[in-house]
A protein has these predicted regions:
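Short, conserved micro-motifs composed of acidic
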Residues: 63-97
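Basic, alpha-helical interaction scaffolds
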Residues: 89-157
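Catalytic palm subdomain of template-directed nucleic-acid polymerases
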Residues: 32-56, 161
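Hydrophobic packing residues in well-ordered alpha-helices of helical domains and bundles
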Residues: 25, 44-47, 51, 65, ...
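Mobile genetic element proteins and their domesticated derivatives, centered on retroelements
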Residues: 3, 14, 30-32, 54, ...
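Short linear motifs embedded in intrinsically disordered, charge-biased segments
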Residues: 164-297
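Active-site palm subdomain of RNA-directed nucleic acid polymerases
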Residues: 4-35
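Short, conserved non-catalytic motifs in the polymerase core
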Residues: 1-6, 35-40, 93, 105-107, ...
Length: 297
């Protein structure tokens, strides 16, 4: 595992070559993303200059980018859609790309990721069904939780669906799984979940959201809470109820995608949690208490 680490160290000075030119530069292993808000030709020129500087940086280190794998994604309805080049070659434009295991689209809607996750999970579930003809509830549920459900829940804080169709696309996989279990009395999905002690996938996504909010606000990990949330008490229009130092403020958004973005969709649910639970220090204790709270409602 030393090779990947040495490679990351080797490319760590890429930022120096494009410093001051971009709004966004993100690296993960050998994947690099450059981003810039482009509304005029000057913005386009800055982004193109960053691409040119990146190519010069690679040449200095005796490397070259695989231009055939480099893509441009134009986001926003008013995006002018300029053409960009690397090493004299025009970059291909794409509306959909996989980024660290998640399908990202130009519209930023999660439908493509939901479809991919459901398809992968269905394939694994089918393999389990063929391998186990008698599906004892204890054994089969352990297999489902370990091999199927993770595909439906990977990084959902980044792409949690909000439309009924996308939610159903994921939930149908779990519904199929519980119908495979032998010995259950009811044919009703919700009653089968109750017999098996399983929550819906939507409920698990909600609890995962709250757990992530707690981690960010407690300063765990690399995310800066001030970049994600605004404290309601800091607002100039704070009321007596919103002045609770634990409460967050919803940032106004005109578009549906903005209203359902993680930092907005979690606010009301977070503010509804009793203060004594939100003040819990350890993440695992918070998750346990919040799970109990949801079960009691």
């Amino acid at each position: 595992m030393l090779g990947p680490l040495l490679f990351v160290i080797f490319i760590n000075d890429l930022e120096d070559s494009v410093e001051g030119l971009l709004d966004i530069l993100r690296k993960f292993a050998d994947d690099t993303k450059l981003g810039q808000e482009v509304t005029r030709e000057e913005d386009r020129d800055r982004l193109q200059q960053a691409l040119d500087e990146s190519c010069l940086w690679a040449e200095r280190w005796g490397m070259q980018f695989n231009v055939s794998k480099c893509k441009v994604m134009h986001m926003g309805t008013s995006n002018p859609g300029y053409q960009y080049h690397m090493g004299g070659q025009a970059l291909e434009t794409t509306d959909e790309e996989r980024d660290i295991g998640v399908m990202i689209t130009a519209s930023l809607k999660p439908s493509a990721q939901c479809a991919k996750a459901a398809k992968t999970a269905q394939a694994v579930l089918g393999q389990l069904a063929r391998a186990f003809h008698y599906r004892d509830r204890h054994v089969f549920m352990r297999l489902y939780k370990q091999y199927v459900r993770p595909h439906l829940e990977f990084s959902t804080q980044a792409w949690s669906p909000w439309t009924a169709g996308d939610k159903a696309c994921l939930e149908k996989v779990q519904e199929r799984a519980v119908r495979m279990v032998s010995g259950l009395k009811s044919d009703d999905y919700s009653e089968r979940l109750s017999e098996l002690g399983l929550p819906t996938l939507e409920e698990r996504r909600h609890q995962a959201d709250m757990a992530m909010v707690h981690k960010i606000l407690c300063g765990r990990g690399s995310l800066d809470s001030s970049q994600w949330f605004e404290r309601a008490a800091d607002s100039v229009r704070a009321t007596r109820s919103s002045a609770n130092p634990l409460n967050l403020k919803v940032r106004q958004g005109r578009l549906e995608i903005r209203r359902n973005f993680f930092s907005n969709r979690v606010v009301n649910s977070w503010n509804d949690i009793p203060s004594d639970i939100r003040e819990t220090v350890r993440s695992e204790n918070f998750q346990r208490k919040y799970k109990q709270l949801r079960a009691s409602r």
